Amino acid sequence: MLLLDGKATAAAIRAELKEEVAAGLAAAGRAPGLAVILVGEDPASQVYVRNKERGCEEAGIRSEAFRLPADTTQETLEVLIDELNGRADIDGILLQLPLPKGLNSQRCLERISPRKDVDGFHPENMGRLALGLPGFRPCTPAGVMTLLERYDLSPSGKKAVVVGRSNIVGKPLALMLGAPGKYANATVTVCHSGTPDLAEECRQADFLFVAAGRPCLVTSDMVKPGAVVVDVGIHRTDEGLVGDCKYDDISCIAAAMTPVPGGVGPMTIAQLLINTVISWKGRTGIAG
């Protein structure tokens, strides 16, 4: 079985971005700038933010973290977003989710300028994705597509099944897989809680993407031998970190599969860095 190593792939991308940034520094006059907003003390969110800061440092991107208390008001948060929208040295704004109770995350996401929405969650960027127009793509599904391309695994002309329909992963991933292109162009089925026979749908997949948010939901009897399996889930259990798929069993029959951890997670951050550099190039007018 081919291990789809997101950790190694992401490291290679960071190295490439570092060279890209270094080459454009003189023309741009400054490094790319990413603002990260963290509200509250959620431990998982703090880990994610530290990982993003570390990734920025390795890629030559200047990151600026804004850590706000859990009792921050909606107005205060929106004022900060407005300030960052107006700063010339900030190319991307990332709002770490989830937000504490009482804060409207959708309102905040819509407040971020679409031109600085490097997470790809603004309705304008989601709409542009649906219409096949240029724009920032949500980082997790875009990272998945980048991983497939790096391993030269093309779903073109194949049956792709996406388990999960969230706005963050499932919906945009289905759109990306069904779009024209060498590393897309698949026939896509989206499964969810209303799917009558999930196992049967999964067994039809040449490419199976699982983003259901349920640990070990997909088992080996639900996977076609020789399929490519991408596990987007990650869960902390008594046995350690697991995904939405039973890795040990499925890896025996799949042609290729992502591990958990070390698969999709690092690619999500890599795609965030890619989006930030793209924004920097566009905003500073440098070529490439």
From Swiss-Prot:
Q: Which GO terms describe its biological process?
A: L-histidine biosynthetic process; methionine biosynthetic process; purine nucleotide biosynthetic process; tetrahydrofolate interconversion
What's a GO cellular component annotated to this UniProt protein?
cytosol
Q: In which pathway does it act?
A: One-carbon metabolism; tetrahydrofolate interconversion
Which keywords are on file for this protein? Amino-acid biosynthesis, Histidine biosynthesis, Hydrolase, Methionine biosynthesis, Multifunctional enzyme, NADP, One-carbon metabolism, Oxidoreductase, Purine biosynthesis
Superkingdom as given in the UniProt entry:
Bacteria
Which amino acids does the record list as binding NADP(+)?
Answer: 164-166, 193, 234
Q: What is its EC number?
A: 1.5.1.5, 3.5.4.9
Q: Which GO terms describe its molecular function?
A: methenyltetrahydrofolate cyclohydrolase activity; methylenetetrahydrofolate dehydrogenase (NADP+) activity
A Pfam entry, by short name: THF_DHG_CYH
Q: Which reaction does it catalyse?
A: (6R)-5,10-methylene-5,6,7,8-tetrahydrofolate + NADP(+) = (6R)-5,10-methenyltetrahydrofolate + NADPH; (6R)-5,10-methenyltetrahydrofolate + H2O = (6R)-10-formyltetrahydrofolate + H(+)
Note the InterPro entries from the entry.
Aminoacid_DH-like_N_sf, NAD(P)-bd_dom_sf, THF_DH/CycHdrlase, THF_DH/CycHdrlase_cat_dom, THF_DH/CycHdrlase_CS, THF_DH/CycHdrlase_NAD-bd_dom
Q: Which family does it belong to?
A: Belongs to the tetrahydrofolate dehydrogenase/cyclohydrolase family.
HAMAP family reported in the protein's UniProt record: THF_DHG_CYH (MF_01576)
Subunit note: Homodimer.
Physiological role: Catalyzes the oxidation of 5,10-methylenetetrahydrofolate to 5,10-methenyltetrahydrofolate and then the hydrolysis of 5,10-methenyltetrahydrofolate to 10-formyltetrahydrofolate.
Name of this protein: Bifunctional protein FolD
Q: Which organism is it from?
A: Nitratidesulfovibrio vulgaris (strain DSM 19637 / Miyazaki F) (Desulfovibrio vulgaris)
Organism lineage string:
Bacteria, Pseudomonadati, Thermodesulfobacteriota, Desulfovibrionia, Desulfovibrionales
Report which gene this protein is encoded by. Answer: folD
